[in-house]
Design a protein with these regions (language model features):
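Acidic, Ala/Val/Gly-enriched low-complexity intrinsically disordered segments
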Residues: 4, 10, 16-17, 42, ...
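Cysteine-centered motifs
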Residues: 6, 24, 29-31
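Intrinsic-disorder-associated, low-complexity terminal segments enriched in Asp/Asn/His/Tyr and depleted
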Residues: 21, 32-42
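N-terminal beta-strand-loop-alpha-helix module at the start
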Residues: 52-122
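Short beta->alpha junction loops
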Residues: 122-130
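Beta-rich, aromatic/charged-enriched effector core domains that present basic-aromatic interfaces
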Residues: 129-266
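Catalytic cores of enzymes that engage adenine nucleotides and/or redox cofactors via long glycine-rich
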Residues: 225-402, 418-419, 430-454
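Alpha-helical support elements that line or immediately flank enzyme active sites
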Residues: 413-417
Length: 459
């Protein structure tokens, strides 16, 4: 049995949608800082009774930010915190150790941040999420359980089944209800149309009613090959030193995972994520644009932001990332093609994929329009099994750091799987297990639609 240090939750049966995203779920109940007391004093007893009836805020492990949804208005005096780590999910399959470490360590450190801010945290390590909820309710008897809208279809089903009240999420820049306004009576949808609508609606890179620079898109300037010289052109982010929490998490998950151990490439705190954002804006974004579609065997990151893990687990919010990029352009620190190309990835493609997921789930996850039924080749889990240099290079990188940039995912891994007829659900599952920034809402549309054409052209 997997140690209870991992937050992997029992999977639902029957669909990709109902068996993913739960492992990264956490539950928080922000709590009153008044210590539980057994005093016979009437005043103490009243305080204890009031504390016991406080509402619970349920926060998922991909919502690790005080500014998201239900947490945004919570204080130590108004809510209680429950943090659950469950062993049920991880025991069913293997995950990349850097992915497991990133999720677990980020959650533990977020819990520490809440404690430091004055919140009392009921941190439970149990076999299942249901057990954790039952134990928490038995001890604290919350007046209600409320959650920010979960980020996966299965998690929303779970919240509904448990009678949890949900509040609207601000973790994305276009809520599905707003997306319906974009769809309107459109007979067809294109990401570019959505992107322009977003630019206007959010007033990003706009001069009045016109796009800054009189162009919406600078793609023709952003497809240059990498330079043949000057490998130091690509800024290298500093490594973080692993702390005691990191070591404890690694000791707990190592025997149940695959891949190379982390070396400090990925931050696991809000502070670290903000440092990564600052590094990207100051050092990397100025050279991002023209080479954003390039690949190099000798350099795994080039000018990519490496911010997707933090955006996808909540340590960073898209609005602050977009504002930082736009400000850098307005201050003359980065060229327009770099700012526009990066911002398009955030408010365009990312938000578009997010809303397509909610528009088409749950059936979308099972689509296989081409009838692809080839099993995932062994090289995906053991790169030494292939003599194809391009595949081995990318797969070695995934094994080493739980990451490859989007061009490698689409143009190398995705193209191979499409040509070989690999089952799209197996490919989705492998990516979900392997990538540090994996989320069902992004993996399903990108694999089923963008990469494998398993949706028959819907995306």
């Amino acid at each position: 049995m997997f140690p209870v240090f991992c937050p992997f939750l029992a999977p639902f049966k029957g669909s990709v949608a109902r068996s993913t995203n739960f492992w990264c779920m956490t539950i928080f109940c922000l709590c009153n800082t008044t210590h539980r007391s057994h005093s016979n004093s009437d005043s103490t007893g009243l305080l204890y009774a009031e504390a016991m009836s406080l509402p619970t805020i349920w926060v998922f492990g991909d919502q690790l930010n005080r500014g998201i949804g239900a947490l945004a208005t919570a204080t130590p005096l108004t809510h209680r915190v429950l943090f659950i780590e469950s062993a049920a999910k991880i025991s069913s399959q293997k995950w990349h150790i850097q992915r497991a470490h990133f999720i677990v360590a980020s959650m533990r450190k977020f819990a520490h941040e809440l404690r430091s801010a004055g919140f009392q945290v009921d941190y439970r390590m149990v076999k299942s999420m249901g057990q954790g909820i039952k134990e928490h309710v038995r001890e604290f008897a919350p007046s209600e359980i409320v959650a920010t809208e979960p980020n996966s279809y299965a998690s929303r089903l779970l919240a509904h089944d448990l009678g949890v009240r949900t509040v609207s999420s601000n973790q994305f820049l276009c809520h599905p209800s707003e997306y319906q306004g974009f769809l309107g009576a459109r007979k067809s949808i294109k990401m570019e149309d959505f992107y322009r609508w977003q630019r206007k609606r959010l007033n990003v890179l706009m001069d009045g009613s016109e796009p800054t620079g009189d162009r919406w898109n600078f793609d023709d300037e952003n497809r240059q090959p990498p330079p043949k010289t000057g490998h130091d052109r690509w800024p290298v982010p500093a490594l973080y030193e692993l702390d005691e929490v990191d070591e404890q998490v690694l000791a707990a998950v190592q025997s149940h995972c695959f891949g190379k151990l982390p070396v400090g490439q990925w931050a696991t705190t809000r502070e670290g994520a903000l440092e990564r954002l600052q590094f990207f804006i100051e050092r990397v974004l100025p050279v991002f644009g023209e080479h954003e579609d390039a690949m190099l065997k000798s350099n795994w990151h080039l000018a990519h932001s490496l911010l997707s893990p933090y955006l996808n687990n909540g340590l960073l919010l898209p609005r602050e990332v977009v504002e930082a990029a736009q400000s850098a352009f307005r201050e003359g620190k980065v060229p327009l093609n770099s700012a526009e190309g990066f911002i398009r990835q955030i408010i365009g493609w990312r938000e578009y994929i997010w809303n397509c997921y909610w528009q088409w789930m749950p059936d979308y996850a099972h689509m296989n329009a081409l009838g692809a039924d080839v099993k995932l080749p062994p090289m995906f889990t053991n790169p030494s099994k292939t003599s194809m240099a391009c595949m081995k290079s990318v797969l070695d990188g995934v094994n080493e750091r739980s990451y490859s940039h989007h061009i490698e995912r689409l143009m190398v891994l995705g193209n191979f799987a499409l040509i070989a007829g690999v089952n799209p659900q197996q490919l989705t599952r492998w990516m979900w297990n392997s990538y540090i920034d994996a989320a069902e809402w992004v993996m399903v549309p990108n694999v089923i639609g963008m990469s494998q054409y398993a949706d028959g052209g819907m995306l």
